[in-house]
C-alpha cells in the first residue's frame, strides 16, 4: 500500500485549537495514523546483514518529487531551528512534548527528535520525527485543513506512529543528479511506505534510527 492510499484513509477529528505552531495540541484533535503492534519481525535480512540499506536512484518517487518542491523551505527549516529550540525549552523539553503527543509504553525511552518533512499526496509537511526505543513517530509542525465527510473544514495536526516491530525495511536514498537531496523511506510489514526528507541533521537522524532498530532487535 502506497503512502498516498495511507493518507486518504486517515480520519480527521475537529481541532480544539487553531494555533498553527503548537506541538501540544489536544490529543483528541490530532489527525492520526497508527500501525498496530500485533506481530514481530526480524531486523536482519541475512546473517550479519542489517536491514537498513543504502540505495541511490535516478527516478523520482512521490518522496523524491517532494524534495524538489521544498526549495527555499529548506533554508526556512534551518532558520526555524533556533526558534524551535527555544519553544521546546519553554514547553518543558522534548520528553514532555512527546508524552503529550503520543502514547508512551512502559520503559520506553525517547532518543531524539529531528526536524524534517513527510511526503503526502498534498505535498511535503514540516514537522518533528521522534525516535524512541519502541517506535518512530511524526507530528506536523502546523495544523492543516481537512474536510470531514460532511464537508466541514477543520484544522488538525498530522500524526503518524510506527512501532519498531512493524518496520520491514529502511532505505537511505539520494538523488544521483542532486546528491544533497536525501531521503529516508520507511516500509512496514503491511506494505505502507513513508518518505521523510529535508532533514536539518540527516545523517544523525539515520544513525539514531539505526541505533533504535538494533537495540530493539536484541
Swiss-Prot record:
Pfam families documented for this protein: GRAM
Domain GRAM: 96-174
Signal peptide (residue range): none
UniProt-listed Gene3D superfamilies: Pleckstrin-homology domain (PH domain)/Phosphotyrosine-binding domain (PTB) (2.30.29.30)
Coiled coil: none
Segments crossing the lipid bilayer: none
Domain of life, per lineage: Eukaryota
Similarity comment: family membership: Belongs to the GEM family.
Protein name: GEM-like protein 6
Amino acid at each position: 500500500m502506497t503512502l498516498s492510499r495511507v493518507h486518504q484513509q486517515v480520519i480527521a477529528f475537529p481541532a480544539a485549537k487553531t494555533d498553527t505552531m503548537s506541538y501540544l495540541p489536544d490529543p483528541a484533535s490530532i489527525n492520526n495514523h497508527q500501525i498496530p503492534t500485533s506481530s514481530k519481525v526480524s531486523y536482519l535480512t541475512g546473517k550479519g546483514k542489517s536491514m537498513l540499506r543504502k540505495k541511490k536512484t535516478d527516478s523520482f518517487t512521490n518522496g523524491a518529487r517532494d524534495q524538489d518542491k521544498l526549495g527555499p523551505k529548506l533554508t526556512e527549516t534551518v532558520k526555524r531551528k533556533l526558534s524551535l529550540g527555544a519553544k521546546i525549552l519553554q514547553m518543558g523539553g522534548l520528553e514532555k512534548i512527546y508524552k503529550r503527543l503520543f502514547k508512551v509504553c512502559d520503559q520506553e525511552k525517547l532518543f531524539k527528535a529531528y526536524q524534517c518533512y513527510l511526503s503526502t499526496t498534498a505535498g511535503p509537511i514540516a514537522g518533528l520525527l521522534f525516535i524512541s526505543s519502541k517506535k518512530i513517530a511524526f507530528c506536523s509542525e502546523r495544523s492543516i485543513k481537512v474536510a470531514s465527510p460532511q464537508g466541514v473544514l477543520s484544522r488538525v495536526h498530522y500524526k503518524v506512529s510506527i512501532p519498531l516491530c512493524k518496520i520491514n525495511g529502511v532505505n537511505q536514498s539520494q538523488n544521483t543528479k542532486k546528491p544533497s537531496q536525501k531521503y529516508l523511506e520507511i516500509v512496514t510489514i503491511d506494505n505502507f511506505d513513508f518518505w521523510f526528507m529535508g532533514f536539518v541533521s540527516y545523517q544523525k537522524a539515520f544513525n539514531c534510527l539505526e541505533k533504535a532498530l538494533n537495540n530493539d532487535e536484541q
